């Protein structure tokens, strides 16, 4: 008799521990959705700079093939919006295509 009570009690304890409640899963999913919304809201920005203007972020550069670039002037790093990627016309065309793809998949407005 005592053995059967111990077996039943052990089975109930295992069942309670093994199967978490449905409420805790819902709370966990809500937190994930909230984090995803915050990330999307923080990344979208509008452009305000033209080619050659100094910038801090890629989203500040306006244009479908314009991206932020880094050049060195007198050993000092300067970040600016640029369109041209090479002096070679073929490589420059490929570079503009890559810039277009990069801007297409960014969250910039």
From Swiss-Prot:
The keyword Disulfide bond applies. Disulfide bonds join 47-62, 59-108, 61-81. The presence of a 'disulfide through disulfide knot' structurally defines this protein as a knottin. GO terms for molecular function: ion channel regulator activity; toxin activity. GO terms for cellular component: extracellular region. This is Hainantoxin-XVIII-2. Putative ion channel inhibitor. Its main location: secreted. Belongs to the neurotoxin 25 family. F7 subfamily. It is found in: Secreted. Keywords: Disulfide bond, Ion channel impairing toxin, Knottin, Secreted, Signal, Toxin. Residues 1-18 form the signal peptide. Expressed by the venom gland. Transmembrane segments: none annotated. It comes from Cyriopagopus hainanus (Chinese bird spider). Residues 19-46 form a propeptide. It comes from the Eukaryota.
